[in-house]
């Protein structure tokens, strides 16, 4: 909110006061005074008054503020109003009375008695007179506004009725019921003349006082049809509308370009175009038992002043003539120059100014403890610890009430009279004694925008710049052009004003199912997305210049939002579960949100706060927010949600609104999710999208296809707009102030020829000196009558007029209008309709034909009206899709055509793509491209034509390498230089000799003959494959790690066991003696035999006698033979050897131990050459030490007598 106020600061400084005027929002009738050159007129909003049964009601033209003004008015079918007096006058035919009441429904009183058979009544607001006709007496009578001084103006008339008067022109009109004629006379009763006669009945008469034309309803008794007719005040320029209505019109009233009329039997008020007569809006007044009677549009333009100034009332003249009467007010005699002071002021001694009365100084205020004077008033105050009671006078000590008895909206104080509710400062207690109202209360003092405290108990309402305070001094309305709704209706896009008028189709071609759209106020374009064709398009607001931004790149887009300041747009794709963004030209596309998102639907953007807001309808429904880049995500709401659908932002108050389609509710909160509040529930059907503007929230409903609006603070005052709708989806309000911060002058100079000046979001065109603004408000004309092109000085006055300025006949206008399909909107004050309480099917509409109403299925559906089913045009073969060039896709209520490859279209028609002319063929430079239906052919020199064939270069590519040899690379060679750039996106061009053609080897992510298409499917599969590959890799690594850990554990166990066994040191079982080694065993228990050292194991190998000059050699049978020799020995035995071999003792140990003789000079670790471990055969393990083994062998006498043995090489192992 702070950021928005900062943007509005220059505007606030420029308009440093709060406007208290009441400009309305409607198109200025031709000839009426307008505002500062814009499209609005300064004045209050018009509204209707009508009689209904024995009551009189009022209702806004938009269907809101439907109130009963008079409860017991009798049969009041004849009525009129006096705007300056703010009174309604009506004839009570039952009691034969003329009565009146104020426009707000107060002070009902009798004026005078009337005779029977009164057939018409009108008010002369300039002469202050009442005029009525008597059909039976044939007279027209006049009286003053108090019912005095009655006199007969005209007599001897033929059944006069339907009196109308234009006091400005001093003319009076009436019709003759029997004769079927129209008459005119002066308001004084002279100059009576017949204007025209007809054989048909004239049902009702009304005047267009601005265009100076007389309108009437001409009824054909035989055909039962009516038409709207008009003529000028002299009876000339008669115009008959071609459109016939089956309604029997009872009363009518004109305002602007519209006629409001009621019928004899239907409980509705119709709005029609006064030129064409076509019905535009049907205002359904159900529940009601009788049709409405008299009807009038109340607005000052309906009763202008004689001097031609429609706004110069006596009250305004008084304000202009007050002179030095400061602080004065206009009294009962506004034309006098006497100053009259308002309450709280007193006239000064010189009688020229009003001075404030200080009530607190005179002690006549009635305050018990404190008093504070203000200009024109005062208020009571209380010290700390006391509260002001609801009477505004007494103070009471603050004693809180028990919590169980307090039902106050703010707080409660316990007094001697019991508990009493009180309110905070700047608020007062309402009539119910419980609710507070004021600037500090939730109702904001009843103000729609700004609440400005004047004292602790008084305040006044104000409006933001660009908005105007209305006559109720509470509500604000946007200035500028009238706002309208733009919404998607499944098969088309429509727009309508808030009052149901100008209900038309913007894009009516078959565009599939369109659910998402938004409006760009800068370029005045509409952006929309297709769910069937999977496109995103944009177009002008008149339906022209359609541009396709994305094709086949979205799946189920259901939400779209425009950043009109940042010039980007964002959309949700429920099918792909992500949110994407792009610039407004479809470039720089990026994914904004793709993680932790399920089924996004609605989306809204706040350009000032630079935040995105969206709804998620998935398994975890919630409302979320993030930055425009997708970071800083925040959950706005997650509880009590089922199907959160549409979402929107009130940029003035920084409030967030959303709807839940499943729960049928509308909710609101602050932008951070705080102060969440439920506005409407159970009576909003199946809401899809929401929009907010001014004081109302709009939302679309699928249950009863329509758009509904409620008050944005209370959820009350519900009004439904419908009319041949199928599934109204996304909707936006189009107005310059709906999206603040817009500068339309930035785009094409706002459409202005010379100077464009931005004013509250609208482009104001100005002209340079010496030029005059043209009637279109944008072009400039030279003062000498010639139109000059700005900046060029070119004379364009060649006798050609712009089309918009050419005169157009009424007949031509009717023909143009007749050729267009006019939609009729219906304003439903309640949900009751003429087709019964059950209503029609959601795919049907209630059609009124004369006095009967029936349900009819909409186009594209079949049934009896109560049950309608979709017609599958594709299956029935009734589609418009050409089977040779397109595929028919059925949609609800229609179908679309998806063009085949080689064709392009708009969803209906498919046209052949001329690849040759567009340069998208693949023929190459050496061929001639010929376009064919849906394809093309390439004609190569000397070869037949084939579709899509690439002709090679006439000079065959050389395969000769630098070394003079022919090189072959997988039978493919590179393309010649003439094909440089043939393959796109990094593809490699190759010549395939086998087929004598060229081909592209595309990089990953691209497909096509020239790698021209991005393979999104491959991209998704690649990411899916990478994900699977990553999962497999992780599993494999985990398995390998587990196996390694298992092996490490086994090795550790083995190592531990080995060390444990080696650490044991058992005694040697053999005695160390000089006995013969053959069969001698040492005595048991004899010590002194040491075991083999643990780290050393030796094996004695045979070598040749080096002394004989022979080289050492391997054993005869190899190393394995030596092992085999030991295998047959018993543990502890000594093997006999030859003189060349030493005796070898085998002792069975875990690793084995071979003991050489002690005379071996190579004994010890230094002389070891080879080693091996002997196997174990289950005998007792004996570890023999090196030292002991030497002593053991030296004890053998045979060994000592032998000649020295050749040296043995020994190897140490560990």
Swiss-Prot record:
- Which keywords fit this entry according to its UniProt record? Disulfide bond, EGF-like domain, Glycoprotein, Growth factor, Membrane, Repeat, Signal, Transmembrane, Transmembrane helix
Provide the residue span(s) of the region labelled Disordered: 1193-1214
Name the cystine pairs.
Answer: 360-371, 367-380, 382-395, 401-412, 408-421, 423-436, 439-451, 447-461, 463-476, 745-756, 752-765, 767-780, 835-846, 840-855, 857-868, 874-888, 881-897, 899-910, 916-929, 923-938, 940-951, 975-989, 983-1000, 1002-1011
Q: Does the keyword Disulfide bond apply?
A: yes
Q: Could you say which residues form the signal peptide?
A: 1-22
Q: Which Pfam family is one of this chain's hits? A: cEGF
Provide Cytoplasmic-side residue ranges. Answer: 1052-1214
| Entry superkingdom | Eukaryota
Which terms does the record give in the GO molecular function aspect? calcium ion binding; growth factor activity
Name of the protein this chain belongs to: Pro-epidermal growth factor
**What's the source species for this entry?**
Sus scrofa (Pig)
User: In the UniProt record, what gene is named as encoding this protein?
Assistant: EGF
